[in-house]
Amino acid sequence: IIFQNRSGNENVIEIADNSFSKSSIEEAILTEGFKYIGLNAFSDCKKLHQVVLPVSVEEIENSAFENCNSLKSISLPMLLKTIGDAAFKGTGLRTLDIPKSVFWIGDDLLAECQSLEHIKIPDNIARITDRMFMNCSGLKKVELHEKLNAIGERAFFGCSSLDFIIIPDSVQQIGQDAFTGTDDMFIVQCSFGSFAEQYCRKNKIKYQLV
């Protein structure tokens, strides 16, 4: 389906809440002018495999694409500002490039994405949110930046393929069970005297000083 903005109205143009939830839609191509993807707009669309978002999209609401398990990839627009809770939870995404324009992301963003293999956190994101990657059983590589300050509760819970992560000195908060259920050989690489080292010692997590 091609969604066209023909109104000529420069105010917020949206895909309304629950518009296509649980439908059999296979493709969603939005033309320029749309700014808002609503709550549950495309959630549980099991056949949805292609989504094209225009540069004009600024906000993706909670659960907008949740459980779209045929969705293997998506390109996020360069003017995007916020991504809501569980927006891509349970999708088939293998990776996700978050634009530098984004200043807020919600909890559970990519939870239950079992095909997710690699993620790089851009330096505009200061915090890995609660359960952001929970039960991403295929996740093998995570790249964190030197400005990151927090890792939320259960952020990597159940990431059974993740065997190491490098935590920068900038991180001053790590939530409960952040790394529970990772690979049996999982090890944190961190600096001597860092918060990450203290967290690992307290929670009996293997670590290596670098």
Model feature map: region roles:
Residues 16-19, 38-41, 61-64, 84-87, ...:
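Consensus positions within tandem repeat domains that build extended binding/scaffold surfaces
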Residues 202-204:
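Short, structured coil segments at secondary-structure junctions
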Residues 1-14, 23-36, 46-59, 69-82, ...:
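Structural signature of tandem-repeat unit edges
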